[in-house]
Amino acid sequence: MARKKGGSGAKNGRDSNPKYLGVKVYGGTEVSAGSILVRQRGTSIHPGNNVGCGKDYTLFAKADGVVTYHERKGRKLASIEAK
């Protein structure tokens, strides 16, 4: 029998890197095409007019304009009102 306990005594002390999720541009703000509007896990906010959705569900502007957030059929949408 070993006199001392094997290595790995500490079970805590780990933490994941921050993911910086959330709304990056709020309603009423003017944006240019390609601007990131929302970073999210899954589609809690869906893309509306002139808004695209990346493979990691990031919403981005497809055209220059003003950002609006609204609800349709119980679903939150982000849209761009083009200039």
Swiss-Prot record:
One of its GO terms (cellular component) is cytosolic large ribosomal subunit. GO terms for biological process: translation. Keywords: Ribonucleoprotein, Ribosomal protein. Gene3D superfamilies: 2.40.50.100. It comes from the Bacteria. One of its GO terms (molecular function) is structural constituent of ribosome. The keyword Ribonucleoprotein applies. Pfam families: Ribosomal_L27 (PF01016). The keyword Iron does not apply. SUPFAM superfamilies: Ribosomal L27 protein-like. Belongs to the bacterial ribosomal protein bL27 family. PANTHER family: LARGE RIBOSOMAL SUBUNIT PROTEIN BL27M (PTHR15893:SF0), RIBOSOMAL PROTEIN L27 (PTHR15893). This is Large ribosomal subunit protein bL27. The gene is rpmA.
